[in-house]
Amino acid sequence: NQEGLFRGR
């Protein structure tokens, strides 16, 4: 999932 990268902030 790319959610983890999106929430990397």
Curated annotation (Swiss-Prot):
Coiled coil: none annotated. A long coiled coil structure formed by 3 polypeptide chains connects the central nodule to the C-terminal domains (distal nodules). The long C-terminal ends of the alpha chains fold back, contributing a fourth strand to the coiled coil structure. It is found in: Secreted. Heterohexamer; disulfide linked. Contains 2 sets of 3 non-identical chains (alpha, beta and gamma). The 2 heterotrimers are in head to head conformation with the N-termini in a small central domain. Keywords: Adaptive immunity, Blood coagulation, Coiled coil, Disulfide bond, Hemostasis, Immunity, Innate immunity, Secreted. GO terms for biological process: adaptive immune response; blood coagulation; innate immune response. GO terms for cellular component: extracellular region. This is Fibrinogen beta chain. Cleaved by the protease thrombin to yield monomers which, together with fibrinogen alpha (FGA) and fibrinogen gamma (FGG), polymerize to form an insoluble fibrin matrix. Fibrin has a major function in hemostasis as one of the primary components of blood clots. In addition, functions during the early stages of wound repair to stabilize the lesion and guide cell migration during re-epithelialization. Was originally thought to be essential for platelet aggregation, based on in vitro studies using anticoagulated blood. Its main location: secreted. Conversion of fibrinogen to fibrin is triggered by thrombin, which cleaves fibrinopeptides A and B from alpha and beta chains, and thus exposes the N-terminal polymerization sites responsible for the formation of the soft clot.
